[in-house]
From Swiss-Prot:
InterPro entries: Kinesin-like_fam, Kinesin_motor_dom, Kinesin_motor_dom_sf, P-loop_NTPase. One of its GO terms (cellular component) is cytoplasm. ATP binds at residues 462-469. This is Kinesin-like protein KIF26A. The modification Phosphoserine is found at residues 30, 1257, 1654. Residues 940-950 have a biased composition (Pro residues). It is found in: Cytoplasm, Cytoskeleton. Disulfide bonds: none annotated. Disruption phenotype: Mice exhibit growth retardation, become emaciated, and die within 5 weeks of birth. The median and mean life span is 15 and 16 days. Macroscopic dissection reveal that mice suffered from megacolon, with dilation from the distal small intestine to the proximal colon and display enteric nerve hyperplasia. Severe occlusion are observed in the distal colon, because the colon motility is not coordinated. Defects are due to abnormal enteric nervous system (ENS) proliferation. Residues 742-751, 1685-1698 have a biased composition (Basic residues).
Amino acid sequence: MVGRGASLCAVQPAVAECGPARETPPLEVSPRKRLPAGLDQDPCSSRPAPEGAGASAEQSHSAGGGGWCRHCHTKLVELKRQAWKLVSGPGTPLRDPCLSTLLLDKLPASGVQPACRPDTESRCDVCTTHLHQLTREALRLLQTPASHEDPNASRGGLAAPSSRDPPGPVGLMGRQPPVGPDRRKATAWPPGPSVQVSVAPAGLGGALSTVTIQAQQCLEGVWSLSRVNSFLPPTCLAEAAVAAVAVADTVRDCAPAAGPERMSKAWGRGAACTTALVTPAPGTSAGGSTGPSAAASFFIRAAQKLSLASKRKKHHPPPAPSTRGTSTYPTDFSGSLQLWPPPVPPCLLRAASKAKENPSSFGKVKVMLRIWPAQGVQRSAESTSFLKVDSRKKQVTLYDPAAGPPGCAGLRHAPTAPVPKMFAFDAIFPQDSEQAEVCSGTVADVLQSVVSGADGCIFSFGHMSLGKSYTMIGKDSSPQSLGIVPCAISWLFRLIDERKERLGTRFSIRVSAVEVCGHDQSLRDLLAEVASGSLQDTQSPGVYLREDPVCGTQLQNQNELRAPTAEKAAFYLDAALAARSTSRAGCGEEARRSSHMLFTLHVYQYRVEKCGQGGMSGGRSRLHLIDLGSCDAAVGRGGEASGGPLCLSLSALGSVILALVNGAKHVPYRDHRLTMLLRESLATTNCRTTMIAHISDSPAHHAETLSTVQLAARIHRLRRKKGKHASSSSGGESSCEEGRARRPPHLRPFHPRAVVLDPDRSAPGLSGDPDYSSSSEQSCDTVIYVGPGGMALSDRELTDNEGPPDFVPIIPALSRRRPSEGPRDADHFRCSTFAELQERLECIDGSEAFPGPQGGSDGAQASPARGGRKPSLPEATPSRKAVAPTVVTSCPRGSPGHDTHRSASDPSKTGTQSEQRVDGSRPEPPASDKTSGGGGRRPLPSPAPPPPRQPEAQGIPKEPGGEGTDSVLRTPPVGMSGQAALPPLLSDSAYLSPSARGRHLERGLLTTTVTLQQPVELNGEDELVFTVVEELPLGGLAGATRPSSLASMSSDCSLQALASGSRPVSIISSINDEFDAYTSQMSEGPGDPGEFPEGTAWAGGSPASSIGSWLSDVGVCLSESRGPTPQPPFSPNSAAGPGPPEFPTPGSSLEESKVRSSECGRPDNPGSARSLHPGEAVATTQTQPGREPWARSPHEVASAQTIHSSLPRKPRTTSTASRARPSRGPYSPGGLFEDPWLLRAEDCDTRQIASTGRAPSPTPGSPRLPETQMMLACAQRVVDGCEVASRMSRRPEAVARIPPLRRGATTLGVTTPAASCGDAPAEAVVHSGSLKTTSGSKKSVSPKGAFFPRPSGAGPPAPPVRKSSLEQSTALTPTQALGLTRAGAPSAFRGEEEARPSGRSDSSVPKATSSLKARAGKMDVPYRPSGHMSLERCEGLAHGSSKVRDVVGRPPRAVPRLGVPSASPPLGPAPACRNSPAKGVGATKPPAGGAKGRNLGPSTSRALGAPVKPLGPVAGKTAGGAVPGPRAAPRAVPGIGAKAGRGTIMGTKQAFRAAHSRVHELAASGSPSRGGLSWGSTDSDSGNDSGVNLAEERQPSSPALPSPYSKVTAPRRPQRYSSGHGSDNSSVLSGELPPAMGRTALFYHSGGSSGYESMIRDSEATGSASSAPDSMSESGTASLGARSRSLKSPKKRATGLQRRRLIPAPLPDAAALGRKPSLPGQWVDLPPPLAGSLKEPFEIKVYEIDDVERLQRHRLPLRENEAKPSQDAEKGPVCISSKLRLAERRQQRLQEVQAKRDHLCEELAETQGRLMVEPGRWLEQFEVDPELEPESAEYLVALEQATAALEQCVNLCKAHVMMVTCFDIGVAATTAVPGPQEVDV
């Protein structure tokens, strides 16, 4: 055994250390030196008993006349050891006579040891044994057949040789690894890698205790070269080796009795066997027992200590084969990994510390070359005659076999020998390389990448019989023979364990195995049998490859089985290998050649954020291990035609791989399934790919070798291009996509691009680098599993109780794009522009979550499955589904929604898709809105869409989501697409399905009129800008009922659905709209049922806690808006504003007026102006007048505002954003949470809108709206990633051209308002509101906020300017300014959120948040912070309150900023404000940049990031600054001067906050409570984190009463990286992600959260993940900040952000605002597209049916309750006023609901007439219990429920009519009618 060790040492000189004396040569060291003499002697004496063996030994030794002395035994051992060392290599035949001669010559001389000093030089003075005799014995032992015997024989027992050996002592039974030859086989590790010391305790006859010392590997040097095999440090390795050698030597040395024979036999057999220590039984030898036992115990202890010191679990010696459990399959890798897992290469663990590698390395494919030795022992000169390897240079030189090596005088040397060819690779494994060496050198870096969130791929390539399968699979006989796959499995789990301990990250590993085999390219799921538990044919019919235009090939429906342990994963490997065609009996060579196995390990990881609110970050990455067949039909190169047209030759396969790796546009044999499979695995630039090319060293295969080497060298030289698939999720997305099809849709993630967690990938993902977004991000889809209560579901709950669901997008905003899941797949990729495609790609995964999975109308069920939030069915589903539904809302993926989203560029598509989308994606949200009842003003048709959304959630209509159904639903029309089918489901399921819910929200948010704007160039992707004129009375619904966010989650869904349903959803114009819609979805739903349902309801319902929080935020915002300080200004502002004044007047209280302003203002001026606006305005107004007070009072006012705001400017978009946000909220870990954000955002937005709508409505309205629109677009885009950018970019133009755009396009409300002069203000208000809604919504959906803050990075800067601007605005119109501030801020928030481009919205919101934050300690941040207050909420509700007010003040500024045409001051000053604020913004932005570090200030940072926003807010705030009152003014001043505000309030925090400003602002945007922006609550992202807190706290009436997520949310900024399965992120997600999710956070989180590493990356990128202090604010802010950063760092956010920023148009406004500096280029770029998008708006009426009942039911209570808290939070003393307000709101709501009911009755009658149904039918079903007191809340709730039910009925009828006649119902815009108004398109 020692000999073996020696040989190993020979193989590995380093092992010499293991010699007896490290300092002296082994031969010179005597065993005594190694061990204390005592030990030596003791062992010797202890062996007397075994001496019986001694006799045998003696006999065997013919040389020794008598027994050899102990010294001679020692000498023998040493000689054997030296002989082994002298053996050249594993392949050297030991029996070679030459070797024997050489050894005889060398051993004696070097073997003379002082210890054995012979009498004479050659004899021992003790026993006179001749040294040569010992030498010959040593050689005999080396060469003895035993050495070649089956290791098991020796393993059977070394004592066996000697019958005399006592059985007990024969503890020699140490397991013997395969003998020399086996070990020598470079490819295998010795079966017994560890030195096993079997000790028979002195007292035990046969009892053996075994100690495994990982020394065999040390001794043998199996891992010597790389030392990767051992976890032990070199010193430990050396010690272990020494100990093992010492033990072995001692054993042999001490067993003279055993004698040479026994030892020789044992030794011979164990040439490579492990060391065995034989301890005689105590009785065996007198006095000898103590020595051996002591020695044995010493070594055992030493070994144990070494093992422990290595800090690695002690690897118990693999039991004898008999002890291993029998495997059901031919192979037993599972048992192997369990018994003797391969040692983890140190380089792997070291790499683990380096979380990531240089991103640049990702573009490169590592190519390694393995030289397979020719069979037989002919690895002689012949093999080296044409192949020379330089391992040091990693080069291989090929000579012409005829010429021979250069310096060789080969017989065939030709005079004109061809020039040798040299090739360099990343690594070369010569013929004698150990399998372990190959595995460690190949797998380590790939595993690191996978664990970090990127995809990884390792595949073998080469001709037949070159060990490809051996390399990949290996053998299960020993750790040294394990192949790459089992090693990767073992090490992956080891790495995961290490990461779990280090980072607390949770992982879930899933395994899938697919095979492409035969000439027919049959695709087989190798785990189908295991998965089904049946013996069904593995020809799993479910597995298929789908070509995805955007994401490339997607492998669908393969089984992914959860593997909690490496053994389980290995078990699946065994099963896959058994199921593989090559394992079948009679499998021929041809079958083997054409068998290609793809074994994939899907790594889902998520980390619960510190906040402990379920906030999680994480994602999915995949490790593809591909065992490629040789493909060639013949042993040679094989012709391509040999196997038929479908058969690829190896050269063809090489060309395919080269093309895929190179990102070539054209891939040969693209239709071949193997090509498709490889594309799915390799074509992602973010995929860490390693190719192991196999060549033969036989000259006979020179041609094959040369061709393989040439191909490998080409691949090695080329660097991965940022392939088209990068953004198309070739890898990640593909993985997502593949998951999409094969996983239940509900488990599908939204586009992972936004969720890359790995910092390296994060940047790319966020930055818009297609490459990065493709693999890592995509593969690392953010997976957030949200439980019913908004609680994050663990993978266990979602899956098999152990792992997270495949994945769910953590970013609802992105998810919103996923809404269209049905037709979406096809439509979704129908893009006229690449940007569009990219956008689709981004949401593909999420949107991919088909309602189907949810299948039922119950989004919840799908959502639960997907979101894992089943419990809160509506909420959970929405939450989970929110991802998809949100996407749906945003852009029904399957349906044109997504397309619309993208088809904006495509006019025809835009029209149709937009329409579809409107009806599919948007309509659904509007329907939801309608259903909410909050949007009573919205025509029933509007509600109809919600049902579609629900179907989407259900998966049936799933208008947006359900591609097929959705299509149909959408087809019915924009106006009423999903209403019919969805209504029922919508109410519940709609919420359930985030997508549905998003839609509902969107619907709720969107007004009837959907302007399908088709700014084609936003992001290069068509963006349908839909303006939903009709605005949901979100406030009304949301206000009362949804205070308790979590509790309401379920209802929230309903509310949301209702809210969404109540209002027709217009497909978000372009991405922005979509984004807004998405955001709005959250916000929208509440909007209609009184924006509150969606927003509030959402906040309350979706994320119950969130809702509370959100409401609080909203409340804060409302309070701010309505708040004492803000109220008056608001009222005046309202008055001042053309539209706002009008509404303000109707609104009893400031808040009411705010709501009015937002709701009415939005519709009134902008709303009216817009086709929908008149009606919408009417609806909104009607709702507003009645509903507004109601909405307002319940804090739904904010919601309403948000909705109105959203509708007017980009209400739809904004609304959508708002709604989307709620959707997101649900989507969030706690759908409730997200919802709350949405709600919050909406609330905030609503307020802001009210405020903006009112105050800024006049002057800032127009300009602001555009900006808002721009912002919104930007935000939306950001949320979507690509889409967001696109939307934004369009939005910017839209913003710039908002007035024209206002036509009802993107900014539904805004557009119209822009149209009219009054509308300009109104629009400003509406737009602002819209923006706010959007912004709020989006902000609320942290992404938006996050995104905006980024765009609104200027936002924070704006605050400083804002001071001046605000003051300016104030000077211009205190009231108006206040209105602007309030309305404007909301507007800005929304707008900003809606379109980053209209930075002001974001600024407003962010600023508001910032203000709130400023209150907390930052003025600039207030604006954003208002939304972000949630984030900063912990900082202080009071702060939030004042901040909110300030935000209210700020909003005007935001409005100006947003208010491209802000009020006159905003307009004139808007630019001025924008400029001034821009400066501030610019200044602030720097802080934002600086604040990045301080993610807490992300809001501010975001604001900074969104200078435009700040400018808007500045204008708004400036105007509102004075008006806002103490809060607004003071805050306005500090807040207004983004810098100043920051400097003032943030003075100390300025830098820090500035850095976080962006994040914060984003968060702020997300948190309506911060500012008077509804969306502030929307900031639920922050909301939960911060926004929710603020809004919720405020809403609750006491800042201290934030939603459950309020505080938690703040800390859970990691949510930003809640990407992967940070399914627990559900809660956090809702909290923080929403703001970021809205637009920014989502994208932001996306980018930051998609990879596991991306978590870290994202954190780094945003600076939020890292900031623990600001974690609360940072959570949302981080995302915001990250987003800002993203904006700042095009590289980081280039892909997502930039794309989203395609909304630069808003930036222009932003630029004007001063935000431009932050996101100048990017954002600026975006504007033109936005403008383009907005240029050609369509008004598409989308009717979304939602569960009005539910919406109303929940919204109302939320509104009332939330309104109260909101007021209280806002006013503080507002507690009383809050009650009054509540009553007022209730009254308003009652009026609105009644008006809506009347309107619905009329519509029902009309619809019945159309359907030829007897009039009056069903009406009795919707009557309210006459016994109820009309003034009571119960009556209102009952009325709302009845109205919701009626609305659903009407929607269903309308949908039916539309489906049958495709007619759009034009509803006369009656301001008195609370229901959403529809404008005929």
